[in-house]
Amino acid sequence: MTKYTSVNSSLPSLPRQTTPTRPATQTGRWDRMGMQTGNTPSSPLGFETKGSLNGSPTLRTTLDTSLSGTRSHPALRATRWMMGVNDIDSIQGDEDHPHDPGPDSDAKKRCASGKAPKDRPTSSVAVASTIRPPCCG
């Protein structure tokens, strides 16, 4: 018969923050993965377990830094577009990618001339190509 022990008992204890960023209103509970849930001041790993992505400057900085050097990969371009980080590529232009036209694209020329660009069919691969530039409304 095999004896199983708890994962938490075999791990070394991690130092906890001595001064929490905010007072805890509940004690919190441990979930199956060993992370503390509930309204707690900090997790055992030292970062906030509660909060949104946009409200956390640490996560936002990490994402901006990790995505800034990878302009040409299509999968990351789609991710950045959905997160709203793709604006710098539209300004600088990146003609090597069909779904991210540069400043000399036909859509922007038609937009400047007062005509709206033609709507293109939407597919899961070419979602970014159906978005109109900001000047077209």
UniProtKB/Swiss-Prot annotation:
Pathway involvement of the protein, from the record: Secondary metabolite biosynthesis
Domain of life: Eukaryota
Ranges annotated as biased composition (Low complexity): 15-27
Start and end residues of each stretch annotated as Disordered: 1-137
Biased composition (Polar residues): 1-12, 51-71
Chain intervals with Basic and acidic residues compositional bias: 94-109
Membrane spanning residue stretches: none
Function in brief: Part of the gene cluster that mediates the biosynthesis of the tetramic acid Sch210972, a potential anti-HIV fungal natural product that contains a decalin core. The PKS module of cghG together with the enoylreductase cghC catalyze the formation of the polyketide unit which is then conjugated to 4-hydroxyl-4-methyl glutamate (HMG) by the condensation domain of the cghG NRPS module. One unique structural feature of Sch210972 is the tetramic acid motif proposed to be derived from the non-proteinogenic amino acid HMG, by a Dieckmann-type condensation catalyzed by the reductase domain of cghG.
Protein name from the UniProt record: Sch210972 biosynthesis cluster protein E
